[in-house]
Amino acid sequence: MSNPPHGGVLKDLLARDAPRHDQLETEAEQLPAIVLTERQLCDLELIMNGGFSPLEGFMNQKDYDNVCENVRLADGNLFSMPITLDVSKAVIDESQLKAGSRVTLRDFRDDRNLAILTIDDIYRPDKAREAKLVFGGDKEHPAIKFLNNTVQEFYIGGKVEAINKLNHYDYVALRYTPAELRVHFDKLGWSRVVAFQTRNPMHRAHRELTVRAARARQANVLIHPVVGLTKPGDIDHFTRVRAYQALLPRYPNGMAVLGLLGLAMRMGGPREAIWHAIIRKNHGATHFIVGRDHAGPGKNSKGEEFYGPYDAQHAVEKYREELGIEVVEFQQVTYLPDTDEYKPKDEVPAGVKTLDISGTELRNRLRTGAPIPEWFSYPEVVKILRESSRPRSTQGFTIFLTGYMNSGKDAIARALQVTLNQQGGRSVSLLLGDTVRHELSSELGFSREDRHTNVQRIAFVAGELTRAGAAVIAAPIAPYEESRNAARDAVTQGGGNFFLVHVATPLEYCEKTDKRGIYAKARRGEIKGFTGVDDPYETPSNAHLTVDVSKQTVRSIVHEIILMLETEGFFDRA
C-alpha cells in the first residue's frame, strides 16, 4: 500500500468535480477569464491532480504569509513554497475582480477553460520579504530575478473547481497523476518506493545510487524527472525522456518505473527540497532521495553557491516526522577502474584509483565529439545525447552589438554578415536597430519600457533563429543592462549561444561623425529621450568583446569577432 498523501487526503479536484463538468464549463464561458502563463499552468495542473495536496487552490494572503514566515499553511500543515496566482492591476480592473468574484482560468496554448477560481482575497505581496524568507535574498538568484522582473504586482488567492485536464501531446502515457501512480504501484504490488528527482540526463552513477538506495530499503525505484520548467540552459525534456527510456532496461527487471512530473521548479534549495518531498509523498513514494545542493541554482556572479551543499538535506531531515517520507541522502559515487565498479566516495580506501567526469567535461565531449567512456554512461544513452547535441561547428549563435547611435554597430554588422556568408555552413540573419524598429516595433516609443520591449522582441527572434542553427547579428542601441541580460537569457535558455560585443566608440566621436545631424537635433531639444544626450547608456559589465571604431577599422573588428568564434569552435576545423 502506498504512502498516505500529505494532509491525509489526496485533493484530486479533477475527480471531485467531474460530475459537475458540464455545469462548470457552461458557467466558465460567462465569467471573466485570466489567461495563465506557463508557470501558472504547471502550478494549476498539480493543484488539480492533487500533486500539491493539501492545497485546493492558489494561496490566499493568510496561507501565503504563513508559508513565507513559518513554512506551513494557516491550518498548520507543513508547506514550504508559496503557490500564488499573480496578476496585473490592469487585469483586476478590466474584469472588476474582488473578493467573492468567480473567474475562469484559461490555457494560453489552446484557449481551453481549465478551472473556475472563487476569489478569497486580492493582495499586494511584499516581494522583498518573500525573496529573503523563501530564497535567501540574493538578487542574482533566478527565482528572485523572476519575482522582481516577471511576477505581477498582485496575487489572487482562492480555491479552484476543476473543469479540464491540461492537454499534453508528448509522452502522455508517462504523465501519471498522483492517483494513477498510486494505482500503478498497487497493481505492481509495490509497498516501498524510492523516488528520484532529476532535471538532468541519468548515467551509470545515477543508476548505481538509485539501485543501492532501493536495495538497502528493499524497495523499488520511481524515476520522477521534472518536465515542466527547469533551469535555463538545461537539456530539453524530449532528449532527457528518451535517455531515461533508454536507461530503464539497465535496471533489474521490475525494479524501476518512469513517471514524468510537470513541475515548474523555483531552484529554491532547502525550501524546494521540502516541497519536492511533499509532492513525491502525494504520488505515493515512501522514500525520497535528496542530493547534494538539491534544487540549487548553481553559483552567482562571484562564483559562490547560493546554498550550502547539505542545506537541503538538513531542511528535509528537520521536518521528516511531519513529512512522513523517509529521506535518503544522496551518496556521491565514483568509478573504480581496477575493479570496474561504482562505490560511494566515503567508502573508497585511500590510494585507490578513481575516475569521474564532471558535467562541464561531459558537455565539452558532446560538443566536440570526443569519446565518452562506457564506464561513465551507457552507449544507448550517449547516442541519444549526441543526436541532440550538435557539434559547435553546426550550432547557431547570436552576436549582439550594443553601443551609441553612429558608434559603427551597423557597419560592423553588415561587414560581419558578408564575412560569415563567405565562410558558409549556416544561414546568416541581420537584425539592425532601425530595421527592427520599422518592421517589428513601429508602435513603440523611446521610453525605458518601450526600449526594453523592443530589445526583447529582437532577442525572441534571435533566439528562435539561433536554436535553428543560424548565425544572427543584432545591432540595437540596447542602452540598459537589464534589457541586455534579458536578451542573453532569451537566447541561451533553449541552449543558444550568445556573445555580447560592446561597440565602445566614445560619444564625442559618434557626434562628430554624425552626418545625419541627429545628435544636433537632440542637443537642440527636437528629439527627446535620446541615448547619450538626455537618456543614459549603461556600460556593459559582461561583454565578451569590447571594440572602438575611433581606434580600429571595421575590418579589424570583424576579424576579432571571427577569431572569437573560431576559438569557441564555431567553424569546422576538420
UniProtKB/Swiss-Prot annotation:
GO terms for molecular function: adenylylsulfate kinase activity; ATP binding; sulfate adenylyltransferase (ATP) activity. Residues 170-394 are annotated as: Catalytic. Sulfate binds at residues 197, 199, 295. Coiled coil: none annotated. Allosterically inhibited by 3'-phosphoadenosine 5'-phosphosulfate (PAPS). Keywords: Allosteric enzyme, Amino-acid biosynthesis, ATP-binding, Cysteine biosynthesis, Cytoplasm, Methionine biosynthesis, Nucleotide-binding, Nucleotidyltransferase, Transferase. The active site is at 198, 199, 200. GO terms for biological process: cysteine biosynthetic process; hydrogen sulfide biosynthetic process; methionine biosynthetic process; sulfate assimilation via adenylyl sulfate reduction; sulfate assimilation, phosphoadenylyl sulfate reduction by phosphoadenylyl-sulfate reductase (thioredoxin). The record marks 330 as: Induces change in substrate recognition on ATP binding. Gene3D superfamilies: HUPs (3.40.50.620), P-loop containing nucleotide triphosphate hydrolases (3.40.50.300), Sulfate adenylyltransferase (3.10.400.10). Residues 1-169 are annotated as: N-terminal. Its main location: cytoplasm. GO terms for cellular component: cytoplasm. It catalyses: sulfate + ATP + H(+) = adenosine 5'-phosphosulfate + diphosphate. It is found in: Cytoplasm. The record marks 203, 206 as: Transition state stabilizer. InterPro entries: APS_kinase (IPR002891), ATP-Sase_PUA-like_dom (IPR025980), P-loop_NTPase (IPR027417), PUA-like_sf (IPR015947), Rossmann-like_a/b/a_fold (IPR014729), Sulf_adenylyltr_euk (IPR027535), Sulf_AdTrans/APS_kinase (IPR050512), Sulfurylase_cat_dom (IPR024951). Homohexamer. Dimer of trimers. HAMAP family: Sulf_adenylyltr_euk. The adenylyl-sulfate kinase (APS kinase) is non-functional. It is involved in allosteric regulation by PAPS. PAPS binding induces a large rotational rearrangement of domains lowering the substrate affinity of the enzyme. Catalyzes the first intracellular reaction of sulfate assimilation, forming adenosine-5'-phosphosulfate (APS) from inorganic sulfate and ATP. Plays an important role in sulfate activation as a component of the biosynthesis pathway of sulfur-containing amino acids. In the N-terminal section; belongs to the sulfate adenylyltransferase family. This is Sulfate adenylyltransferase.
